[in-house]
Protein backbone atom coordinates (compact mmCIF):
# COMPACT_ATOMS: atom_id res chain seq x y z
CA UNK A 1 0.00 0.00 0.00
CA UNK A 2 2.64 2.53 0.98
CA UNK A 3 4.90 1.64 -1.97
CA UNK A 4 1.96 2.20 -4.28
CA UNK A 5 1.24 5.53 -2.63
CA UNK A 6 4.79 6.77 -3.05
CA UNK A 7 4.80 5.84 -6.74
CA UNK A 8 1.54 7.67 -7.29
CA UNK A 9 2.82 10.66 -5.35
CA UNK A 10 5.94 10.86 -7.50
CA UNK A 11 3.88 10.65 -10.69
CA UNK A 12 1.46 13.37 -9.73
CA UNK A 13 4.12 15.67 -8.29
CA UNK A 14 5.84 15.61 -11.66
CA UNK A 15 2.67 16.87 -13.36
CA UNK A 16 0.88 19.27 -11.01
CA UNK A 17 0.64 20.49 -7.44
CA UNK A 18 -1.51 18.31 -5.16
CA UNK A 19 -0.81 19.71 -1.70
CA UNK A 20 -0.26 17.04 0.94
CA UNK A 21 -1.81 14.10 -0.91
CA UNK A 22 0.04 10.81 -1.11
CA UNK A 23 -2.60 9.17 -3.27
CA UNK A 24 -5.51 10.40 -5.39
CA UNK A 25 -8.18 7.82 -6.09
CA UNK A 26 -11.53 7.83 -7.90
CA UNK A 27 -14.36 6.69 -5.66
CA UNK A 28 -17.46 7.34 -7.74
CA UNK A 29 -18.59 7.93 -11.30
CA UNK A 30 -21.94 9.50 -12.18
CA UNK A 31 -22.62 9.81 -15.90
CA UNK A 32 -19.49 11.59 -17.18
CA UNK A 33 -18.47 12.94 -13.76
CA UNK A 34 -15.68 11.25 -11.80
CA UNK A 35 -15.25 12.08 -8.14
CA UNK A 36 -11.93 11.72 -6.33
CA UNK A 37 -10.53 11.64 -2.83
CA UNK A 38 -7.01 12.39 -1.66
CA UNK A 39 -5.46 10.07 0.91
CA UNK A 40 -2.86 11.18 3.44
CA UNK A 41 -1.23 8.29 5.29
CA UNK A 42 0.63 8.24 8.60
CA UNK A 43 4.34 7.64 8.31
CA UNK A 44 5.68 4.14 8.96
CA UNK A 45 2.34 2.35 8.91
CA UNK A 46 2.52 -1.24 10.11
CA UNK A 47 0.77 -3.82 7.93
CA UNK A 48 -0.45 -5.83 10.91
CA UNK A 49 -2.16 -2.79 12.46
CA UNK A 50 -5.32 -0.92 11.50
CA UNK A 51 -5.69 2.83 11.91
CA UNK A 52 -8.57 5.26 12.41
CA UNK A 53 -9.80 7.08 9.32
CA UNK A 54 -10.93 10.70 9.12
CA UNK A 55 -13.01 11.86 6.17
CA UNK A 56 -13.13 15.60 5.46
CA UNK A 57 -15.89 17.39 3.54
CA UNK A 58 -15.18 20.97 2.46
CA UNK A 59 -17.59 23.87 2.93
CA UNK A 60 -19.08 26.28 0.42
CA UNK A 61 -22.85 26.11 0.71
CA UNK A 62 -23.06 23.02 -1.56
CA UNK A 63 -22.21 25.55 -4.31
CA UNK A 64 -18.45 26.17 -4.20
CA UNK A 65 -15.37 24.89 -2.42
CA UNK A 66 -12.39 22.60 -2.82
CA UNK A 67 -11.24 19.41 -1.14
CA UNK A 68 -7.97 21.15 -0.19
CA UNK A 69 -9.73 23.15 2.56
CA UNK A 70 -8.73 20.73 5.31
CA UNK A 71 -5.32 19.67 4.00
CA UNK A 72 -3.45 21.21 6.95
CA UNK A 73 -5.69 19.51 9.50
CA UNK A 74 -5.29 16.23 7.62
CA UNK A 75 -1.52 16.57 7.46
CA UNK A 76 -1.34 17.04 11.23
CA UNK A 77 -3.72 14.18 12.02
CA UNK A 78 -1.90 11.82 9.66
CA UNK A 79 1.27 12.52 11.62
CA UNK A 80 -0.70 11.61 14.73
CA UNK A 81 -1.69 8.24 13.28
CA UNK A 82 -4.93 8.72 11.34
CA UNK A 83 -5.45 7.90 7.66
CA UNK A 84 -7.10 11.03 6.27
CA UNK A 85 -9.32 11.43 3.22
CA UNK A 86 -10.10 14.74 1.49
CA UNK A 87 -13.25 14.16 -0.52
CA UNK A 88 -14.70 15.70 -3.67
CA UNK A 89 -18.47 15.85 -4.02
CA UNK A 90 -20.79 17.40 -6.55
CA UNK A 91 -21.48 21.11 -6.14
CA UNK A 92 -23.73 23.53 -7.99
CA UNK A 93 -21.00 25.72 -9.53
CA UNK A 94 -19.29 22.77 -11.22
CA UNK A 95 -22.00 20.18 -11.68
CA UNK A 96 -25.30 22.14 -11.60
CA UNK A 97 -26.48 19.92 -8.77
CA UNK A 98 -28.54 20.37 -5.62
CA UNK A 99 -27.55 19.74 -1.98
CA UNK A 100 -29.24 16.34 -2.29
CA UNK A 101 -26.59 15.10 -4.73
CA UNK A 102 -23.88 16.42 -2.40
CA UNK A 103 -25.24 14.25 0.41
CA UNK A 104 -25.49 11.21 -1.84
CA UNK A 105 -21.80 11.64 -2.69
CA UNK A 106 -20.80 12.03 0.96
CA UNK A 107 -22.54 8.76 1.79
CA UNK A 108 -20.91 7.08 -1.21
CA UNK A 109 -17.50 8.23 0.06
CA UNK A 110 -18.01 6.72 3.52
CA UNK A 111 -19.23 3.47 1.99
CA UNK A 112 -16.24 3.34 -0.36
CA UNK A 113 -13.79 3.86 2.51
CA UNK A 114 -15.47 1.29 4.74
CA UNK A 115 -15.66 -1.26 1.91
CA UNK A 116 -11.95 -0.82 1.14
CA UNK A 117 -10.79 -0.49 4.74
CA UNK A 118 -8.22 -3.27 4.51
CA UNK A 119 -6.65 -1.77 1.40
CA UNK A 120 -6.05 1.53 3.18
CA UNK A 121 -5.03 -0.01 6.49
CA UNK A 122 -7.96 1.40 8.43
CA UNK A 123 -10.33 0.15 11.09
CA UNK A 124 -13.85 0.21 9.56
CA UNK A 125 -15.26 0.76 13.05
CA UNK A 126 -13.19 3.91 13.64
CA UNK A 127 -14.27 6.22 10.83
CA UNK A 128 -14.60 9.89 11.76
CA UNK A 129 -16.53 12.22 9.45
CA UNK A 130 -15.57 15.88 9.60
CA UNK A 131 -16.46 19.02 7.72
CA UNK A 132 -17.00 22.75 7.83
CA UNK A 133 -20.22 24.67 7.20
CA UNK A 134 -22.07 22.80 4.41
CA UNK A 135 -19.35 20.15 4.66
CA UNK A 136 -20.22 19.87 8.33
CA UNK A 137 -23.81 19.31 7.29
CA UNK A 138 -22.70 16.47 5.03
CA UNK A 139 -20.63 14.87 7.78
CA UNK A 140 -23.53 15.04 10.25
CA UNK A 141 -26.09 13.92 7.67
CA UNK A 142 -24.13 10.80 6.75
CA UNK A 143 -24.71 9.79 10.36
CA UNK A 144 -28.27 10.99 10.85
CA UNK A 145 -30.19 11.25 7.58
CA UNK A 146 -31.51 7.87 6.48
CA UNK A 147 -32.42 8.83 2.92
CA UNK A 148 -30.49 10.27 -0.02
CA UNK A 149 -28.59 7.13 -0.96
CA UNK A 150 -27.14 6.61 -4.43
CA UNK A 151 -29.00 3.71 -6.03
CA UNK A 152 -25.75 2.37 -7.49
CA UNK A 153 -24.06 2.20 -4.07
CA UNK A 154 -23.59 -1.09 -2.26
CA UNK A 155 -26.38 -0.27 0.15
CA UNK A 156 -25.65 -3.06 2.61
CA UNK A 157 -22.49 -1.14 3.60
CA UNK A 158 -23.26 1.47 6.25
CA UNK A 159 -22.46 5.13 5.47
CA UNK A 160 -22.70 6.01 9.17
CA UNK A 161 -19.41 7.21 10.67
CA UNK A 162 -18.39 6.27 14.19
CA UNK A 163 -17.67 9.83 15.32
CA UNK A 164 -18.16 13.38 14.06
CA UNK A 165 -16.01 16.52 14.18
CA UNK A 166 -18.08 19.48 13.00
CA UNK A 167 -16.64 22.93 12.26
CA UNK A 168 -19.48 25.53 12.38
CA UNK A 169 -21.74 23.00 10.67
CA UNK A 170 -25.04 23.69 8.97
CA UNK A 171 -27.28 21.52 11.12
CA UNK A 172 -30.70 23.18 10.76
CA UNK A 173 -32.22 23.25 7.27
CA UNK A 174 -35.76 23.90 8.47
CA UNK A 175 -37.72 27.15 8.10
CA UNK A 176 -35.42 29.95 9.23
CA UNK A 177 -32.37 27.70 8.97
CA UNK A 178 -29.59 27.81 6.40
CA UNK A 179 -30.45 26.44 2.97
CA UNK A 180 -34.19 26.13 3.51
CA UNK A 181 -34.91 27.98 0.25
CA UNK A 182 -33.16 25.15 -1.61
CA UNK A 183 -34.12 22.22 0.61
CA UNK A 184 -37.77 23.19 0.97
CA UNK A 185 -40.19 20.57 2.20
CA UNK A 186 -37.47 17.90 2.15
CA UNK A 187 -35.96 19.38 5.31
CA UNK A 188 -37.51 16.86 7.77
CA UNK A 189 -35.40 14.09 6.23
CA UNK A 190 -32.39 16.21 5.17
CA UNK A 191 -31.70 18.41 8.20
CA UNK A 192 -29.39 16.84 10.83
CA UNK A 193 -31.15 18.62 13.69
CA UNK A 194 -34.44 17.03 12.69
CA UNK A 195 -32.99 13.51 12.52
CA UNK A 196 -31.13 13.08 15.80
CA UNK A 197 -31.96 9.70 17.28
CA UNK A 198 -30.60 7.14 19.71
CA UNK A 199 -27.23 5.83 18.61
CA UNK A 200 -26.08 9.10 17.03
CA UNK A 201 -22.25 9.09 16.96
CA UNK A 202 -20.24 11.05 19.54
CA UNK A 203 -19.78 14.56 18.22
CA UNK A 204 -17.42 17.50 18.62
CA UNK A 205 -19.14 20.77 17.63
CA UNK A 206 -16.86 23.82 17.17
CA UNK A 207 -18.49 27.24 16.72
CA UNK A 208 -17.61 30.92 16.89
CA UNK A 209 -20.00 33.10 18.89
CA UNK A 210 -20.11 35.70 16.09
CA UNK A 211 -21.11 33.20 13.41
CA UNK A 212 -23.64 34.93 11.14
CA UNK A 213 -25.02 31.65 9.75
CA UNK A 214 -25.11 29.24 12.71
CA UNK A 215 -26.68 30.77 15.84
CA UNK A 216 -25.22 29.70 19.16
CA UNK A 217 -28.72 28.91 20.39
CA UNK A 218 -29.13 26.42 17.52
CA UNK A 219 -25.88 24.70 18.47
CA UNK A 220 -26.94 24.55 22.12
CA UNK A 221 -30.28 23.06 21.14
CA UNK A 222 -28.52 20.48 18.97
CA UNK A 223 -26.35 19.52 21.94
CA UNK A 224 -29.40 19.26 24.19
CA UNK A 225 -31.23 16.95 21.76
CA UNK A 226 -28.12 14.80 21.33
CA UNK A 227 -27.78 14.41 25.08
CA UNK A 228 -31.51 13.70 25.41
CA UNK A 229 -31.15 10.61 23.18
CA UNK A 230 -28.06 9.50 25.11
CA UNK A 231 -25.38 10.62 22.66
CA UNK A 232 -22.31 12.66 23.46
CA UNK A 233 -22.00 16.16 21.99
CA UNK A 234 -19.10 18.36 23.09
CA UNK A 235 -19.88 21.96 22.13
CA UNK A 236 -16.93 24.37 22.24
CA UNK A 237 -17.67 28.06 21.68
CA UNK A 238 -14.96 30.48 20.57
CA UNK A 239 -15.66 34.03 21.68
CA UNK A 240 -16.11 36.70 18.99
CA UNK A 241 -15.14 34.37 16.15
CA UNK A 242 -17.00 34.49 12.81
CA UNK A 243 -18.05 31.80 10.39
CA UNK A 244 -15.00 30.00 9.02
CA UNK A 245 -12.81 30.95 12.00
CA UNK A 246 -11.14 27.52 12.05
CA UNK A 247 -9.47 27.81 8.64
CA UNK A 248 -5.69 27.79 8.32
CA UNK A 249 -5.49 31.50 7.48
CA UNK A 250 -6.78 32.24 11.00
CA UNK A 251 -3.81 30.40 12.47
CA UNK A 252 -4.50 30.89 16.19
CA UNK A 253 -7.94 29.31 15.94
CA UNK A 254 -6.79 26.73 13.42
CA UNK A 255 -4.37 25.56 16.12
CA UNK A 256 -7.00 25.68 18.86
CA UNK A 257 -9.56 23.69 16.89
CA UNK A 258 -6.98 21.12 15.80
CA UNK A 259 -5.96 20.64 19.43
CA UNK A 260 -9.61 20.30 20.44
CA UNK A 261 -10.02 17.67 17.73
CA UNK A 262 -6.96 15.81 18.99
CA UNK A 263 -8.24 15.88 22.58
CA UNK A 264 -11.67 14.63 21.50
CA UNK A 265 -10.21 11.74 19.51
CA UNK A 266 -7.97 10.82 22.44
CA UNK A 267 -11.05 10.70 24.66
CA UNK A 268 -12.64 8.19 22.26
CA UNK A 269 -9.53 6.02 22.29
CA UNK A 270 -8.77 6.74 18.62
CA UNK A 271 -5.47 8.49 19.42
CA UNK A 272 -2.76 8.05 22.03
CA UNK A 273 -1.08 10.98 23.76
CA UNK A 274 2.14 10.22 21.91
CA UNK A 275 3.75 11.02 19.59
CA UNK A 276 3.44 14.75 20.17
CA UNK A 277 3.26 16.66 16.90
CA UNK A 278 3.59 20.39 16.41
CA UNK A 279 0.45 21.98 14.99
CA UNK A 280 1.73 24.03 12.07
Where are these regions (language model features)?
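C-terminal catalytic histidine-bearing segment of alpha/beta-hydrolase fold enzymes
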Residues: 38, 220-223, 227-280
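Primarily recognizes the serine-hydrolase "nucleophile elbow" in alpha/beta-hydrolase
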Residues: 68, 108-183, 187-188, 192
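Alpha/beta-hydrolase active-site loop
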Residues: 97-118, 257-259
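Short beta-strand/loop motif that positions the catalytic acidic residue
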Residues: 205-207, 211
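Conserved alpha/beta-hydrolase "acid-adjacent" motif
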Residues: 212-218
